[in-house]
UniProtKB/Swiss-Prot annotation:
More about this protein: The mouse protein shows increased stability and much reduced propensity to form amyloid fibrils, compared to the human protein.
Residues where L-thyroxine binds: K35, E74, S137
Name of the protein: Transthyretin
One GO CC term on file: protein-containing complex
GO BP terms in the entry: negative regulation of glomerular filtration; phototransduction, visible light; retinoid metabolic process
Membrane-spanning ranges: none
Keywords in alphabetical order: Gamma-carboxyglutamic acid, Glycoprotein, Hormone, Phosphoprotein, Secreted, Signal, Sulfation, Thyroid hormone, Transport
Organism: Mus musculus (Mouse)
Family matches, as Pfam families: Transthyretin
PTM annotation (4-carboxyglutamate): residues: E62
Membership in a protein family: Belongs to the transthyretin family.
Length: 147
């Protein structure tokens, strides 16, 4: 149990450090950003396919945005402030394809993060995931938009 707490503390610290660094052009205005790290190799997880869905009033999921993580393990520019309205969203990381390209047979097909966004006013969200072939952990940093 203590090792799990230490692991989660380290993950939260990593997200904090990545958020505290200098923002590049456009990054500070990105309302939804995804960061994926490979726990086996200790590096950013590159080319992870990411799909974002928005829950409809009927309860089904409609495609909202998609992309792949860059060399930094980050995916920016998924949406705009105007499109990222209050609602329930699902971020789906294609973990199986990522591990298969590395020659590893993983347990999970996907890693999903489901969350309510902007219910307390407009915010910016960083969803961070730490992947290994048989587990994953996620956390989020929710902040006020920077002008």
């Amino acid at each position: 149990m203590a090792s799990l707490r230490l692991f989660l503390l380290c993950l939260a610290g990593l997200v904090f450090v990545s958020e505290a660094g200098p923002a590049g052009a456009g990054e500070s205005k990105c309302p939804l950003m995804v960061k994926v790290l490979d726990a086996v190799r200790g590096s950013p997880a590159v080319d992870v396919a990411v799909k974002v869905f928005k829950k409809t009033s009927e309860g089904s999921w409609e495609p909202f945005a998609s992309g792949k993580t860059a060399e930094s393990g980050e995916l920016h520019g998924l949406t705009t402030d105007e499109k990222f309205v209050e609602g329930v969203y699902r971020v789906e990381l294609d973990t199986k394809s990522y591990w298969k390209t590395l020659g590893i047979s993983p347990f999970h097909e996907f890693a999903d993060v489901v969350f309510t966004a902007n219910d307390s006013g407009h915010r910016h969200y960083t969803i961070a995931a730490l992947l290994s072939p048989y587990s994953y952990s996620t956390t989020a940093v929710v902040s006020n938009p920077q002008n």
